[in-house]
Design a protein with these regions (language model features):
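Short, glycine/polar-rich helix-capping loops at beta-to-alpha or helix-loop-helix junctions
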Residues: 220-231
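Short, small-residue-enriched loops and turns at beta-alpha junctions
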Residues: 188, 220-221, 244-247
Length: 348
C-alpha cells in the first residue's frame, strides 16, 4: 500500500543539501521519484531509465524497545541522509543509478509507542503489537521495490524490520531467501510477540527464510535457547571469538565460506550496527569489529550475484555519550560508508 510510504520530493531534502563550486554532490546526481505517477509505475519507469538501487528509511525504535533495548534508532535515517547526500559524486561511485525514494510511514505508530513502557507487561505487549503492524508496512513498501526489479538499501530502525523485507523478497521470488547477518546476536529469540530480537525466527517459521548465517556472533551474548533454536533450524554462525580472538578463520574466509554453502536462492545482506565497536547503537558494544571490517563484510557479500538488498539497522545516534549531534555525525559517516561499500561492490 502506497499509503505506508512517504515519497520524497526536492523540498523534502533541500534543507539537508549543500553545494560547492566545481563539485557535484551525490544528491545532484541521484534521482527522485515522479510524484505525478502511481508509485508502482514510477518505480518501474525508474528501472527502465537506468535506476538500480533504492534508498529507503525507517524512522522507528519500536522494535528495539519491544526487545527491552534502548531508544534512538529513529534518528539513524536523517543522520545518514545528511552525510550521504553531500558526499562528492565521482568516478568511484554510481550514485546516478540511485533513487532516493523516501521513508516508511511510522509517525502514528511512534506516537502510540512513546506512551508505552517496556517495563510494564501490558504495555510491552502493546509495543510488540505496534511492531507487528510496522512489519505489514515494511513488507508493503518493499514489495513495490522488488516488483520493479530494484535493489533496496534500507536504513534506520531496529532489526525487527528484517521480517518485512524478507517476506517481501520471498513472496516476490516465490521462494524462501538466504540471509547473511553481521551481528553479535542471532536475533533468533522465540516468537513471543514481535520485536527486534526475533525477526529471523518469524521469517523461518513462516517459511520465508531458507539458509541463515550469522557472522561475528558473540559466544557470550546469546542464550543457550537461542543457540539451540539456531541448531535445530540448521542455521549456522561464525563467532566473533573464532574470527577476532582465536583467529581460527579470517573475516573474508568466513563470509566466503558461508556464501558458498548456500543454494541458489536470493540473498539478503544484514548489518546490525551493534557489531561495530563504539557505535552509538541500541546495544552498545566495546568488543566488536572495526568500521573497515564491516565495510569489507558488505563488499564480499554484495559481490555475490544473488545479493538483492542491504539492510543497515540499530544505529541510535542519541545513544552517543556526547549527545545526539555528535552521534548523528558518527552514525551518518558509518552508514554512508557501508552504503558506499555495497554500491561499489555491485558496480565492480
Amino acid at each position: 500500500m502506497t499509503s505506508y510510504l512517504t515519497v520524497y520530493d526536492e523540498s523534502a531534502v533541500k534543507a539537508l543539501c549543500t553545494t560547492r563550486a566545481n563539485e557535484t554532490k551525490a544528491w545532484q546526481s541521484m534521482a527522485l521519484l515522479d510524484t505525478q505517477v502511481n508509485v508502482q509505475q514510477a518505480l518501474i519507469d525508474a528501472a527502465q531509465f537506468g535506476i538500480r538501487y533504492v534508498l529507503l528509511g525507517i524512522c522507528e525504535d519500536i522494535g528495539p524497545r519491544a526487545n527491552l533495548g534502548n531508544k534512538g534508532a529513529q534518528h539513524a535515517w536523517p543522520a545518514f541522509l545528511k552525510r550521504f547526500l553531500n558526499q562528492p559524486h565521482n568516478q568511484f561511485i554510481a550514485t546516478q543509478k540511485v533513487l532516493l525514494l523516501g521513508e516508511v510511514n511510522t509517525t502514528d505508530l511512534m506516537l502510540q509507542s512513546n506512551q508505552l513502557s517496556a517495563k510494564q507487561p501490558e504495555q510491552l505487549t502493546q509495543l510488540r503489537e505496534l511492531c507487528r503492524q510496522l512489519d505489514e508496512r515494511v513488507e508493503a513498501v518493499l514489495s513495490l521495490i522488488f516488483k520493479a526489479g530494484l535493489e533496496p538499501i534500507v536504513i534506520g530502525g531496529g532489526h525487527n524490520n528484517c521480517l518485512g523485507i524478507i517476506r517481501a523478497l520471498s513472496k516476490h521470488s516465490q521462494n524462501p531467501i538466504n540471509a547473511i547477518n553481521l551481528d553479535p546476536h542471532a536475533d533468533f529469540r522465540p516468537c513471543e510477540g514481535r520485536h527486534s530480537g526475533n525477526g529471523f525466527t518469524y521469517a523461518y517459521n513462516e517459511q520465508h527464510l531458507n539458509s541463515y548465517h550469522v557472522i561475528g556472533l558473540h559466544e557470550l551474548k546469546n542464550n543457550q535457547a537461542t543457540l539451540d533454536a539456531m541448531a535445530q533450524a540448521n542455521h549456522s554462525f561464525t563467532s566473533y571469538q573464532a574470527i577476532a580472538v582465536r583467529r581460527e578463520i579470517t573475516l573474508s574466509s568466513a563470509v566466503t565460506h558461508a556464501l558458498n554453502g548456500t543454494d541458489n536462492y536470493a540473498l539478503g545482506i544484514e548489518v546490525d550496527l551493534d557489531s561495530i565497536t563504539y557505535m552509538p547503537v541500541s546495544a552498545y558494544n566495546c568488543s566488536g569489529f572495526s568500521v573497515a571490517d564491516a565495510e569489507h563484510f558488505v563488499h564480499v557479500a554484495a559481490s555475490n550475484r544473488r545479493a538483492k538488498y542491504l539492510h543497515l539497522c540499530e544505529a541510535a545516534p542519541d545513544q552517543h555519550p556526547n549527545g545526539l549531534d555528535i552521534g548523528a555525525e558518527h552514525a551518518g559517516q558509518v552508514l554512508s560508508a557501508l552504503t558506499n561499500s555495497y554500491l561499489q561492490a555491485k558496480e565492480q
